[in-house]
Amino acid sequence: MSENSHIKVIVGMSGGVDSSVSAYLLKQQGYQVEGLFMKNWEEDDNDEYCAAADDLKDAQAVCDKLGIELHTVNFAAEYWDNVFEYFLAEYKAGRTPNPDIMCNKEIKFKAFLEFAAQALGADFIATGHYVRRELRDDKYVMCRGLDDNKDQSYFLYTLSHEHIGQTLFPVGDIAKPEVRRIAEEQDLITHDKKDSTGICFIGERKFKDFLQKFLPAQPGVIEDTDGNNVGEHEGLMYHTLGQRKGLLIGGMKEGSGEPWYVVDKDLERNVLIVGQGKDHPRLYSNGLNANQLHWVDRIGPKGTTRCTVKTRYRQEDLSCTLLVGEDGMARVLFDEPQKAVTPGQSAVFYAEDVCLGGGIIDSVIK
């Protein structure tokens, strides 16, 4: 009998290949494995309802194949209160939030963790995230996933060492192609299912159409960097820094004749500011200020620290100097100017392969 046979692990089953293989691997390792499918969104149209129903069907098929029980739970109320309302408030304030990070914090590693422990008697939970956990100096740290292309530590920086200690990440030290190969070898229905992309509650819908249902758009003018009126926008919330498509001013050939890009937003005047050329100087910043800091070890760096930072997912690590102030703000100075650093997104800090934590970008330093 396996030494793990008395340890109960509840796997978050999404209906995707990563959680499917996670459940399979844990079963192979002798754990007592059960699945839990979370419903986080009350669908408002048939397409989204079908997508969620398909995911549940796939999760059930995988659990049946593996011979494990699948539980379901509805966290739609928690999701609305803690993730969706934050998402809307950030857009209303002119920032560009990352709801996946908030979902991990409030749902997967709070509501799910508590439900699994209290209602299902879990010793551990497990997810299909591409990160690794290691015990260093009596504390768990979160390391990047072995597959650089799939590493998801950026989305999990709000976890603490206690969360990591209670969670298993079975695919964290496996490359994605190998995960798919295992799924195919085991004849799991999800082996060739495409990875989900975009914001889960929007799905395949047009972002603009979705947002319009919840936030009234405030049209305004588009100005170039010299203050000239060059067009009109339908709402600042539809635009992000560095954006080229959807500006509806493509026919203008003024200035250099290069394409127009969003370089700034003037929230007070409700003005979208654009410049020509993908490397327009206004797109670059020398650093950033971040708030709502969270450190995995719950202590964090003190004073001035050399480390690396990511200001968006899949970005290469940027060398920087990090200064954490007494006021709970982080001031980050890049070694080289960086493009399209966006308030509302997260800045996540690393010491080599270890994710230290991060915060929300409040403003940029020009």
Swiss-Prot record:
Tagged with keyword Cell inner membrane: no
A GO BP entry: tRNA wobble position uridine thiolation
Renumbered residue ranges of the record's region Interaction with target base in tRNA: 98-100
Keywords: ATP-binding, Cytoplasm, Disulfide bond, Nucleotide-binding, RNA-binding, Transferase, tRNA processing, tRNA-binding
Leading EC class: transferase
Function: Catalyzes the 2-thiolation of uridine at the wobble position (U34) of tRNA, leading to the formation of s(2)U34.
NCBIfam families: PRK00143.1 (NF001138), trmU (TIGR00420)
Protein's name in the database: tRNA-specific 2-thiouridylase MnmA
Gene field: mnmA
